[in-house]
């Protein structure tokens, strides 16, 4: 039985390696400077599109921590003149799904849709509303700020969050990587619609974006899709950077008292 299991695992690994070996990735750049990666695959009638931006929380201006996270969050809550409820329903009606996330370095949006032309075209139109024409409605901004602030307050009572924030601060000091990605209560309260619009304009440009297209479309169709995405994004040729990380000299043990019954231990050291 054990030998048969090993044989099955070996065959599976060989199959996977062979699949990766045959994977053909086409690359090009759009006229606006977006980098595109495309994998054609007709096994399933599915199309996946992922658009990445150099718009992570490390780009938050001092005094406006939480701006990157809030901007990304609001882009999907009303766009192209369509409110958040109708937008979600229209994606759902055609069996499409939109998602995304933001981290220290980057923000991204992803779309999964059926590849048949009617569903695909409708899904891409809605997707482009989100990344091309976010509305940033002021009442929704205020509502979501309150929700995020409530989550921050709750998280600051949890030992895991307290430990993670202290650990990152010990590693990165005053570098943007040492800050809370969600921001803090004081800075979030001050953010407004103009801040979000300006951050979107500065950091969601086609010049610093990358587009990944995988699935049941031809190369010509993928090029048309990538161009239509790239053309509608803010234009510009500004290349944003993140300050180099300076190694901290802190060595030792930091203990934080907490009434929780469990202990959280985080350890780290300089590495590549």
Could you say what each language-model-derived stretch is?
Residues 6-18:
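Bacterial N-terminal signal peptides
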Residues 20-46:
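N- or domain-start disorder-to-order transition segments that initiate the globular core
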Residues 22-27, 169-209, 241-246:
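Histidine-acidic residue clusters that define the catalytic metal-binding segment
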Residues 37-39, 44-70, 84-131, 149, ...:
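M16 family metallopeptidases and their MPP-like homologs
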Residues 84, 88-89, 134-153, 218, ...:
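Acidic/histidine-enriched alpha-helical segments
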Residues 127-136, 230-237:
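A common structural junction motif
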Residues 147-165, 249-262:
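Short acidic/His-enriched helical or mixed secondary-structure segments at domain edges of catalytic enzymes
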Residues 177-181, 186, 208-272:
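An aromatic/glycine/proline-enriched structural segment found at the starts
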């Amino acid at each position: 039985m054990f030998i048969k299991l090993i044989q099955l695992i070996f065959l599976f690994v060989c199959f996977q390696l062979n699949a990766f070996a045959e994977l053909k990735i086409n690359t090009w750049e759009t006229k606006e400077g977006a980098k595109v990666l495309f994998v054609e695959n007709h096994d399933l009638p599915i199309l996946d599109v992922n658009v990445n931006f150099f718009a992570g929380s490390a780009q938050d201006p001092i005094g406006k921590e939480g701006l990157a996270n809030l901007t990304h969050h609001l882009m999907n809550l009303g766009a192209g003149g369509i409110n958040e409820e109708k937008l979600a329903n229209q994606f759902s009606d055609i069996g499409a799904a939109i998602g995304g996330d933001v981290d220290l370095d980057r923000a991204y949006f992803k779309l999964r849709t059926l590849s048949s032309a009617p569903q695909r075209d409708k899904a891409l139109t809605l997707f482009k509303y989100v990344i091309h024409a976010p509305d940033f409605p002021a009442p929704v901004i205020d509502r979501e700020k309150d929700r995020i602030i409530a989550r921050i307050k709750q998280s600051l009572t949890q030992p895991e969050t307290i430990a993670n924030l202290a650990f990152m601060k010990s590693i990165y000091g005053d570098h943007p990587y040492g800050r809370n990605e969600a921001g803090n209560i004081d800075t979030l309260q001050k953010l407004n619609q103009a801040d979000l619009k300006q951050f979107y304009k500065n950091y969601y440009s086609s010049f610093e974006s990358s587009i990944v297209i995988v699935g049941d479309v031809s190369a010509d169709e993928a090029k048309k899709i990538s161009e239509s995405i790239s053309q509608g994004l803010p234009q510009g040729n500004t290349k944003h950077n993140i300050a180099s990380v300076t190694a901290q000299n802190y060595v030792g043990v930091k203990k934080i008292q907490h009434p929780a019954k469990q202990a959280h231990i985080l350890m780290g050291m300089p590495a590549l």
